[in-house]
Structures are given as C-alpha cells and as structure tokens.
Amino acid sequence: MEFRIHLLKIILFLAIAFEFLSIKAFATELNNKIKFEIKASEKLEWYQLDNKIVALGNAEVKSNLFKINADEIEGFYNGQIGKGKIKKLIAKKNAAFKSSQIFINSNYMEYDLEEEILIVTGNNISMTSNLGSINAQKSLVYEKSKKQIFLEGNVLIELKNPNSKIYANRLIISIDEKENITLVKAIDMVNVKLDELQQNIFSDEAEFDNLKRKINFKGNVILNQNDSTLKGNNAIIDFEKGLSSITSTKQSSVTGVFY
C-alpha cells in the first residue's frame, strides 16, 4: 500500500514537472526572431488546430521590446510552435501595454506584430509618456512604423510642461525613434487651458510642438484671459518667449498681441 502511494506521488511529481517544462519551452520559442516569454498564474492552454495559445490569470507576454499584462491573453502564431512566429496578441480585461516610453491601459487591446500596430478600444483608455497623461473614451491606435498614435473620443491630454490641458475629439501624436512625443495635433472641438498664462483657448485645430515649445491654433480661435476675449483665425502661444498672439484675415476682426 505504501509502495503504491509512493509511486503515485512520483508519477504526480513527474507529470507536474513535465507540464511546467513543456509550457516554459514553447512559451519562450514562439518567435524565431524576437523571443517571447508567456506567463500565467492559472494556466496556459494550447489550441494546436487553431494555432493559438491562451494565458489565463495574471497573464504576461514579455519581449525585449514591450510587455503586455492582462487577465487573459491570446496569442496567434504561424507555422509550427517553436519554428513559427507569433503574428497577433489579444489582451482582455485589465490590459496594460508597456514599451520604453509609453504606458497604455484599457480593458481590450490587439497587437498585430507583423504590421506593428496596437489597437486599443474601450471607454476608459489611458496613456502616459514623457509629455504627460492622456485619456480617451473610444479608441487608441499606435502605428509604430509610422511613429504615430491616434486617439479618439473625448480626448484629454494633461501636459507636464507647460502645465496645461488639451481637450479634443481626436488627437494625433508624433513620436521619435525613442518614443518621445515631439508633436501633438488636436482636431475637432479643441479647448486648451493654460494654467500658467491663465488662458482658455478654443479653436478648430491646435498643434503643440514639443521641440519648439509652441502651440499653433487654426480656425475660429477664441482666446479668453481674465475678463478679456479675443477672436481670430489663427493664434500662437510661444512658451519660450512668453508671447501670445492672435491674428485674422478678416478686416473687421480684432488682432491683439500681448505679453
């Protein structure tokens, strides 16, 4: 009897060990160019007919370029496991994407590794970067090859320097090779609040150049400061010079420049 119990323990131990080793092996050899490591606190499921791996419970996919965490992550691959490569990742519930300079959170995201496009959807999307924090209520698309990020749906970006807020329906962000934000373009129902200058500006479009430290406003510009209101077609806020200017092509409109 004791011998049977002892034998069962050995078999159980070997089964657990073999399962762990096999999971670790295919989880780290899914891509023959970029190595991935897939972890999960509950279990990893391998659907061979669908070429799919599912990680459940505190799931994590990690490479030398990025990391994705979520309650559940699905990985789709081409070819045979260990010889093929992952082509797509889907993260569900409490999903988080992290690269060198960009952190994105939402309840759902898809990452096309072949096209290098991250698609994030949901009504509570957040992103942080070297520039500040951003929130959106519809979608975020990060096209790495184009070095651009597109956000849509009641977008709010809170800048660290200068201390200000930009509201818009859509936002287009340009980044450099190191993922630092260089340019932010706000489109549709734009409202910019500049705390340091005590200005509140409305326009059709606004473009913040992080390198030149300027914001350019275009179309139906309304600049409010204290009790003063100025209207025009274009405006520029130069943070380096501490200069605000508003101009218009209409002769009847007021043009003002003040420090």
What is the predicted function of each stretch?
Residues 9-22:
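Bacterial N-terminal signal peptides
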Residues 25-259:
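N-terminal amphipathic/hydrophobic interface segments
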Residues 1-6:
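N-terminal secretory signal peptides that target proteins for export/translocation
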